Amino acid sequence: MDLSTGRPRDTWGSKAAFVLAAAGSAVGLGNIWGFPTVAGQNGGAAFLLIYLAAVALIGAPVMLAELIVGRRTQKNPVGAFKALAPRSMWVVVGGLGVFTGIIILSFYSVIAGWTLSYIFKTITGTFVAGVDTEAIYNELAGNAVPAISWHLLFIMITIYVVLGGVRDGIERWTKVLMPVLFALLVLLAIRAVTLSGAEAGLAFYLKPDFSKVTGAVILSAIGQAFFSLSLGMGAMITYGSYVSKRDDLVSSAAWVTFADTTIAILAGLIIFPTLFHAGLEPGAGGPGMVFVVL
Protein backbone atom coordinates (compact mmCIF):
# COMPACT_ATOMS: atom_id res chain seq x y z
CA MET A 1 0.00 0.00 0.00
CA ASP A 2 1.31 3.46 -0.95
CA LEU A 3 0.66 5.54 2.15
CA SER A 4 0.91 8.82 0.25
CA THR A 5 -2.01 7.97 -2.06
CA GLY A 6 -3.88 5.24 -0.21
CA ARG A 7 -3.74 3.03 -3.34
CA PRO A 8 -2.06 -0.37 -3.68
CA ARG A 9 1.62 0.05 -4.57
CA ASP A 10 2.41 -0.69 -8.19
CA THR A 11 4.56 -3.73 -8.99
CA TRP A 12 6.56 -4.97 -11.95
CA GLY A 13 4.45 -6.87 -14.46
CA SER A 14 6.56 -10.04 -14.20
CA LYS A 15 9.87 -11.33 -12.93
CA ALA A 16 11.35 -10.98 -16.42
CA ALA A 17 10.17 -7.37 -16.56
CA PHE A 18 11.86 -6.64 -13.23
CA VAL A 19 15.10 -8.31 -14.31
CA LEU A 20 15.18 -6.28 -17.53
CA ALA A 21 14.35 -3.05 -15.69
CA ALA A 22 16.87 -3.63 -12.90
CA ALA A 23 19.48 -4.69 -15.43
CA GLY A 24 18.66 -1.54 -17.37
CA SER A 25 19.37 0.45 -14.23
CA ALA A 26 22.60 -1.42 -13.47
CA VAL A 27 23.76 -1.65 -17.08
CA GLY A 28 24.80 1.69 -18.42
CA LEU A 29 27.76 3.98 -18.80
CA GLY A 30 29.44 2.23 -15.88
CA ASN A 31 29.71 -0.87 -18.06
CA ILE A 32 30.08 0.44 -21.60
CA TRP A 33 32.01 3.62 -20.83
CA GLY A 34 33.47 3.20 -17.35
CA PHE A 35 34.52 -0.44 -17.31
CA PRO A 36 36.77 -0.47 -20.42
CA THR A 37 38.34 2.83 -19.35
CA VAL A 38 39.16 1.64 -15.82
CA ALA A 39 40.24 -1.80 -17.06
CA GLY A 40 42.58 -0.20 -19.59
CA GLN A 41 44.13 1.96 -16.89
CA ASN A 42 44.62 -0.97 -14.50
CA GLY A 43 46.17 -3.76 -16.52
CA GLY A 44 43.38 -5.29 -18.58
CA ALA A 45 42.91 -9.01 -17.85
CA ALA A 46 44.24 -8.92 -14.28
CA PHE A 47 41.72 -6.19 -13.47
CA LEU A 48 38.96 -8.19 -15.21
CA LEU A 49 39.52 -11.25 -13.00
CA ILE A 50 39.51 -9.18 -9.81
CA TYR A 51 36.40 -7.37 -11.01
CA LEU A 52 34.58 -10.67 -11.64
CA ALA A 53 35.54 -11.88 -8.16
CA ALA A 54 34.32 -8.62 -6.63
CA VAL A 55 31.01 -8.90 -8.47
CA ALA A 56 30.46 -12.50 -7.34
CA LEU A 57 31.65 -12.20 -3.74
CA ILE A 58 30.59 -8.65 -2.87
CA GLY A 59 28.38 -7.12 -5.55
CA ALA A 60 25.76 -9.88 -5.88
CA PRO A 61 25.20 -10.27 -2.10
CA VAL A 62 24.93 -6.51 -1.62
CA MET A 63 22.44 -6.28 -4.49
CA LEU A 64 20.35 -9.05 -2.93
CA ALA A 65 20.43 -7.26 0.42
CA GLU A 66 19.25 -4.00 -1.16
CA LEU A 67 16.42 -5.77 -2.99
CA ILE A 68 15.34 -7.47 0.25
CA VAL A 69 15.28 -4.13 2.09
CA GLY A 70 13.26 -2.56 -0.71
CA ARG A 71 10.65 -5.31 -0.94
CA ARG A 72 10.38 -5.66 2.84
CA THR A 73 9.67 -1.96 3.42
CA GLN A 74 8.16 -0.99 0.03
CA LYS A 75 9.67 2.45 0.43
CA ASN A 76 12.36 4.67 -1.05
CA PRO A 77 15.89 4.49 0.46
CA VAL A 78 15.26 7.13 3.12
CA GLY A 79 11.88 5.70 4.08
CA ALA A 80 13.26 2.15 4.05
CA PHE A 81 15.94 2.81 6.64
CA LYS A 82 13.54 4.89 8.69
CA ALA A 83 11.09 1.97 8.73
CA LEU A 84 13.74 -0.62 9.61
CA ALA A 85 15.52 1.45 12.26
CA PRO A 86 13.27 4.26 13.49
CA ARG A 87 14.86 7.01 15.57
CA SER A 88 18.36 5.89 14.58
CA MET A 89 21.10 7.38 12.43
CA TRP A 90 20.63 4.71 9.76
CA VAL A 91 18.27 7.04 7.94
CA VAL A 92 21.40 9.04 7.03
CA VAL A 93 22.57 6.05 4.96
CA GLY A 94 19.45 6.30 2.82
CA GLY A 95 19.92 10.04 2.44
CA LEU A 96 23.55 9.61 1.43
CA GLY A 97 22.48 7.06 -1.17
CA VAL A 98 20.03 9.52 -2.72
CA PHE A 99 22.67 12.27 -2.64
CA THR A 100 25.16 9.92 -4.33
CA GLY A 101 22.62 9.22 -7.07
CA ILE A 102 22.24 12.96 -7.68
CA ILE A 103 26.02 13.39 -7.94
CA ILE A 104 26.28 10.47 -10.38
CA LEU A 105 23.43 11.90 -12.45
CA SER A 106 25.30 15.20 -12.70
CA PHE A 107 27.97 13.64 -14.91
CA TYR A 108 26.07 10.61 -16.22
CA SER A 109 23.57 12.91 -17.89
CA VAL A 110 26.37 14.82 -19.62
CA ILE A 111 27.93 11.62 -21.01
CA ALA A 112 24.46 10.39 -22.00
CA GLY A 113 23.97 13.67 -23.86
CA TRP A 114 27.18 13.00 -25.76
CA THR A 115 25.76 9.56 -26.62
CA LEU A 116 22.60 11.12 -28.07
CA SER A 117 24.78 13.45 -30.11
CA TYR A 118 26.74 10.50 -31.48
CA ILE A 119 23.52 8.68 -32.37
CA PHE A 120 22.42 11.75 -34.33
CA LYS A 121 25.81 12.05 -36.03
CA THR A 122 25.69 8.38 -36.99
CA ILE A 123 22.22 8.71 -38.52
CA THR A 124 23.22 11.84 -40.46
CA GLY A 125 26.36 10.20 -41.89
CA THR A 126 29.06 12.07 -39.97
CA PHE A 127 31.09 8.94 -39.26
CA VAL A 128 32.46 7.94 -42.65
CA ALA A 129 35.70 6.09 -43.36
CA GLY A 130 38.77 8.13 -42.47
CA VAL A 131 36.97 10.72 -40.34
CA ASP A 132 38.95 12.18 -37.42
CA THR A 133 36.93 10.80 -34.50
CA GLU A 134 39.15 12.48 -31.92
CA ALA A 135 38.46 15.90 -33.47
CA ILE A 136 34.70 15.20 -33.42
CA TYR A 137 34.86 14.23 -29.75
CA ASN A 138 36.96 17.26 -28.80
CA GLU A 139 34.59 19.57 -30.65
CA LEU A 140 31.59 18.21 -28.74
CA ALA A 141 33.25 18.03 -25.31
CA GLY A 142 34.87 21.45 -25.67
CA ASN A 143 31.83 23.33 -26.99
CA ALA A 144 29.33 24.26 -24.29
CA VAL A 145 26.29 25.01 -26.47
CA PRO A 146 25.84 21.62 -28.19
CA ALA A 147 26.96 19.73 -25.08
CA ILE A 148 24.37 21.48 -22.90
CA SER A 149 21.68 21.11 -25.57
CA TRP A 150 22.13 17.35 -25.82
CA HIS A 151 22.34 17.16 -22.03
CA LEU A 152 18.98 18.91 -21.66
CA LEU A 153 17.42 16.64 -24.29
CA PHE A 154 18.52 13.59 -22.32
CA ILE A 155 17.08 15.06 -19.11
CA MET A 156 13.73 15.67 -20.83
CA ILE A 157 13.61 12.11 -22.19
CA THR A 158 14.39 10.79 -18.71
CA ILE A 159 11.61 12.86 -17.15
CA TYR A 160 9.16 11.59 -19.77
CA VAL A 161 10.01 7.94 -19.03
CA VAL A 162 9.93 8.36 -15.24
CA LEU A 163 6.57 10.15 -15.35
CA GLY A 164 5.14 7.03 -16.97
CA GLY A 165 5.63 5.18 -13.70
CA VAL A 166 6.83 1.64 -13.17
CA ARG A 167 4.85 -0.30 -15.79
CA ASP A 168 3.99 2.34 -18.38
CA GLY A 169 7.34 4.09 -18.17
CA ILE A 170 10.43 2.21 -17.05
CA GLU A 171 9.17 -1.33 -17.73
CA ARG A 172 7.74 -0.53 -21.16
CA TRP A 173 10.95 1.05 -22.42
CA THR A 174 13.39 -1.45 -20.93
CA LYS A 175 11.51 -4.34 -22.55
CA VAL A 176 12.42 -2.80 -25.91
CA LEU A 177 15.75 -1.10 -25.29
CA MET A 178 17.56 -3.82 -23.31
CA PRO A 179 17.25 -6.53 -26.01
CA VAL A 180 18.26 -3.95 -28.64
CA LEU A 181 21.30 -2.94 -26.57
CA PHE A 182 22.40 -6.54 -26.12
CA ALA A 183 21.98 -7.33 -29.83
CA LEU A 184 23.99 -4.25 -30.83
CA LEU A 185 26.81 -5.12 -28.43
CA VAL A 186 27.00 -8.69 -29.73
CA LEU A 187 27.20 -7.44 -33.33
CA LEU A 188 29.86 -4.87 -32.40
CA ALA A 189 31.88 -7.50 -30.52
CA ILE A 190 31.81 -9.83 -33.53
CA ARG A 191 32.97 -7.01 -35.76
CA ALA A 192 35.67 -5.87 -33.32
CA VAL A 193 37.34 -9.28 -32.92
CA THR A 194 37.62 -9.64 -36.71
CA LEU A 195 39.57 -6.38 -37.15
CA SER A 196 43.27 -6.45 -38.01
CA GLY A 197 45.33 -6.20 -34.84
CA ALA A 198 42.44 -7.46 -32.72
CA GLU A 199 44.60 -10.33 -31.41
CA ALA A 200 46.76 -7.91 -29.42
CA GLY A 201 43.68 -6.29 -27.93
CA LEU A 202 42.21 -9.66 -26.96
CA ALA A 203 45.52 -10.70 -25.39
CA PHE A 204 45.62 -7.49 -23.34
CA TYR A 205 42.04 -8.03 -22.22
CA LEU A 206 42.03 -11.80 -21.63
CA LYS A 207 45.61 -12.78 -20.67
CA PRO A 208 46.25 -11.67 -17.08
CA ASP A 209 49.54 -10.22 -15.88
CA PHE A 210 49.34 -10.50 -12.10
CA SER A 211 52.50 -8.44 -11.65
CA LYS A 212 50.28 -5.43 -12.32
CA VAL A 213 47.96 -6.24 -9.42
CA THR A 214 48.31 -3.74 -6.59
CA GLY A 215 46.13 -2.62 -3.72
CA ALA A 216 44.95 0.30 -5.83
CA VAL A 217 43.91 -2.05 -8.65
CA ILE A 218 41.92 -4.22 -6.23
CA LEU A 219 40.16 -1.18 -4.79
CA SER A 220 39.42 0.08 -8.31
CA ALA A 221 37.89 -3.28 -9.24
CA ILE A 222 35.68 -3.33 -6.14
CA GLY A 223 34.64 0.27 -6.72
CA GLN A 224 33.84 -0.48 -10.36
CA ALA A 225 31.73 -3.46 -9.29
CA PHE A 226 29.65 -1.22 -7.01
CA PHE A 227 29.46 1.50 -9.67
CA SER A 228 28.42 -0.73 -12.56
CA LEU A 229 25.83 -2.61 -10.45
CA SER A 230 24.32 0.66 -9.15
CA LEU A 231 24.94 -0.35 -5.55
CA GLY A 232 25.10 1.89 -2.51
CA MET A 233 22.92 4.67 -3.86
CA GLY A 234 19.46 3.26 -3.21
CA ALA A 235 18.57 2.37 -6.79
CA MET A 236 18.14 -1.33 -6.05
CA ILE A 237 16.25 -0.56 -2.84
CA THR A 238 13.82 1.49 -4.90
CA TYR A 239 13.51 -1.15 -7.63
CA GLY A 240 13.09 -3.86 -5.00
CA SER A 241 10.22 -1.95 -3.41
CA TYR A 242 8.13 -2.67 -6.51
CA VAL A 243 8.89 -6.42 -6.67
CA SER A 244 5.96 -8.76 -6.11
CA LYS A 245 6.04 -10.91 -2.99
CA ARG A 246 5.75 -13.95 -5.27
CA ASP A 247 9.05 -13.36 -7.08
CA ASP A 248 12.27 -15.06 -5.99
CA LEU A 249 14.77 -12.32 -5.15
CA VAL A 250 17.81 -14.62 -5.12
CA SER A 251 17.40 -15.70 -8.74
CA SER A 252 16.37 -12.17 -9.74
CA ALA A 253 19.53 -10.68 -8.24
CA ALA A 254 21.60 -13.40 -9.92
CA TRP A 255 20.08 -12.66 -13.34
CA VAL A 256 20.56 -8.90 -12.96
CA THR A 257 24.19 -9.40 -11.93
CA PHE A 258 24.76 -11.82 -14.81
CA ALA A 259 23.28 -9.43 -17.39
CA ASP A 260 25.26 -6.49 -16.04
CA THR A 261 28.55 -8.40 -16.00
CA THR A 262 27.98 -9.92 -19.44
CA ILE A 263 27.51 -6.48 -20.97
CA ALA A 264 30.62 -5.16 -19.20
CA ILE A 265 32.65 -8.05 -20.64
CA LEU A 266 31.16 -7.47 -24.10
CA ALA A 267 32.14 -3.81 -23.87
CA GLY A 268 35.73 -4.84 -23.26
CA LEU A 269 35.61 -7.23 -26.22
CA ILE A 270 34.52 -4.30 -28.35
CA ILE A 271 36.82 -1.58 -27.05
CA PHE A 272 40.23 -3.26 -26.73
CA PRO A 273 40.42 -4.99 -30.14
CA THR A 274 39.24 -1.75 -31.75
CA LEU A 275 41.74 0.23 -29.68
CA PHE A 276 44.70 -1.88 -30.82
CA HIS A 277 43.36 -1.87 -34.40
CA ALA A 278 43.51 1.93 -34.32
CA GLY A 279 47.02 1.89 -32.85
CA LEU A 280 45.98 3.58 -29.61
CA GLU A 281 47.30 2.90 -26.11
CA PRO A 282 44.92 1.27 -23.58
CA GLY A 283 43.98 3.64 -20.79
CA ALA A 284 45.56 6.63 -22.50
CA GLY A 285 42.31 8.04 -23.83
CA GLY A 286 40.68 8.70 -20.47
CA PRO A 287 36.93 9.29 -20.30
CA GLY A 288 36.69 9.99 -24.04
CA MET A 289 38.29 6.68 -25.08
CA VAL A 290 35.02 4.93 -25.94
CA PHE A 291 33.78 7.85 -28.04
CA VAL A 292 37.07 8.17 -29.95
CA VAL A 293 37.53 4.43 -30.56
CA LEU A 294 33.97 3.50 -31.55
Residue positions per predicted region:
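Hydrophobic alpha-helical membrane-insertion segments
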Residues: 55-60, 96-117, 180-189, 259-270
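Membrane-embedded translocation segments of transport machinery
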Residues: 2-12, 171, 175-294
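Select transmembrane alpha-helical segments in multipass membrane proteins
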Residues: 11-22, 47-50, 88-102, 149-152, ...
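Hydrophobic alpha-helical transmembrane segments of multi-pass membrane proteins
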Residues: 20-26, 52-57, 96-107, 153-160, ...
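Membrane-interface "cap" regions at the ends of multi-pass membrane proteins
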Residues: 1-34, 62-67, 71-84, 88-95, ...
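Transmembrane helix-boundary motif of multi-pass solute transporters/channels
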Residues: 14-54, 200, 234-240, 251-254, ...
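Membrane-interface alpha-helices at helix entry/exit sites of multi-pass transporters
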Residues: 9, 46-51, 91-95, 133, ...
